[in-house]
Amino acid sequence: MKKKVIFRSGSLRMGGLERVLIEVLQTIDKEKFDIYLVIDDDCGEENIFEKDIPKDIRYFFLKSEELIRETEKYKAKKKNIIYKLIYNLMMEKENRVMYKNMQEILKELGEIDVIVDFDGGASKYIEKLDIKKKIVWIHNSISNLKKKEGKIKRFGKRLEKYDKVVAICDEMKEEIENIYPTLKGKVSRIYNPFNFERIEKLMNDESELTEEQIKMLEEDYCIAISRLDVIQKDYDTLLKSFKILKAKGIEQKLYIIGDGPSKKIIEEWIKEYQLENLVFLLGRMKNPYVWLKNSNFFIHSSKFEGFGLVLVEAGYSGKVVISSRCPVGPRDILKDGECGVLFEVGNEEELADNIEKILKNQELKKEYEKLIKERVKEFDSKNVMKEYEKLIEEI
């Protein structure tokens, strides 16, 4: 008899976690499981991945677009004490609505064998749900919580509510077990799955490019792909490294694909470092893979990461990956520097030196390209989904 499984997550907006969720839903064996999807937020037009949910999966939203919009109205003004109180009341209302709607969904679906809390967002009420087994996925490093003892304790208590905890790389698994020794035996490592067949098709698809973009593809450029958010992504270090290279007479072009709240700050840095003729912000691209395929190499400058999906995608495209040595994620993917180049977070001199080495040493470049292409085979969804399914079957 097939197990009935609910996957739950926060939204269907554009994001790495959401992309992984869709990949899981599209590739999990429906002969083994009856799959249902529960999403917290109905974001209307921002439900980018709603169209990609498999047709044979029923899905539900816990919060309406209207309720979310009403709460957001007060969030923007919560510096004012009155609005802050109203915002807190609205958040309490949202939590009540979510719990009530979840209970109604469970009543409609009948007995559920497993819930997969894909982003940990159900931890406030998970123990109240009449579901046999509960699994939580952890997608981000918890090292940034270490200095906040209260948050560390609260996070540990949340994890204790689940029967299984899944970390997306070995370093993250070790991190969780070291901070929370009582969880040893409950933590598994399962990589994020990648549909390389789909990526291969997109790498060769130039159908939606303009004439100007096709000309840009023919340039000699390296590439960075990430959200324009300087809280997590270390664009200052990245741009400073190109300033150093320019001072040495090395004029390497850099295309940056992505959008986000820090776009203006990054534009100001480009002007300040006089890189207007070398660094180009291309915005969000529906198909970044064709740009990856035609690039010289890939750079990822970040202060911290969860897994770093784009590093695997860059590796599959056969490009050298140069990345920050974040606490988790890139080190695991690049096998601590065996399959790519790592530099210390915030060290623009080291990054500039590494870029120069790759530009000047073609033998080294070819060796890294070969090694990373082989390494990323481990993340193929055909292999990873066997681990997903085994975990759900055996819990």
Where do the PLM segments sit?
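A short, well-ordered alpha-helix in the C-terminal region of glycosyltransferases
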Residues: 350, 357, 364-381, 386-390
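Conserved acidic donor-binding segment of nucleotide-sugar-dependent glycosyltransferases
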Residues: 335-337, 341-348, 357-363
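Aromatic "clamp/platform" in nucleotide-sugar-dependent glycosyltransferases that forms part
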Residues: 284, 303
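Short hydrophobic beta-strand element within catalytic cores of glycosyltransferases
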Residues: 320-324
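A short, active-site helix/loop in glycosyltransferases that binds the activated sugar's phosphate group
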Residues: 124-126, 162-187, 194
